[in-house]
Amino acid sequence: NINYGTNNKFVCGIVLSVNDFNYFAPISSFEKQQKTNILIKNSKGETISSIRFSFMFPIPKIEIKIKDFLKEEYKYRRLLLEEWQYCNSIKDKIISKANYIYKRYNSGYDKMLLKNCCNFKLLEEKCLEYQSYLEPIEEVAAAREIEDKDIEEENKEDWEIER
């Protein structure tokens, strides 16, 4: 969820592997067919949303959160479930489209795509930078946890309550 003043906006998407990175491809209420998206349909065949591959970006594994549909209101839960079911039914098409958009953008061939797409290589560089920033924090947190346990064990007699 992203906070927008008094409201939270749920950011929903698909995580898939592209160029050895986890990529997050957002799902949007945008319902117009474009060459850089896949329309998502409900059980009646009506378009309900789309996967926007031009806006996909690499995401560190630690930042990926799984949405619990059961925590949502019934109507919204039904929408999420329909999107999820449809996406699972076309997994191969989704993977193929993500890789196609990624390669086409990086080839520099499609000038319109260059104007309307995220710069995947730059985002990958920034993702690696961010991950290198996170790794020392994780190591410090893990070391701190070990230290705390060692200190607790050493000073156990000092803080135990006599009975």
What role is predicted for each listed range?
Residues 9, 41, 79:
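Sparse, context-dependent recognition of short Cys/His-centered cofactor- or disulfide-binding micro-motifs
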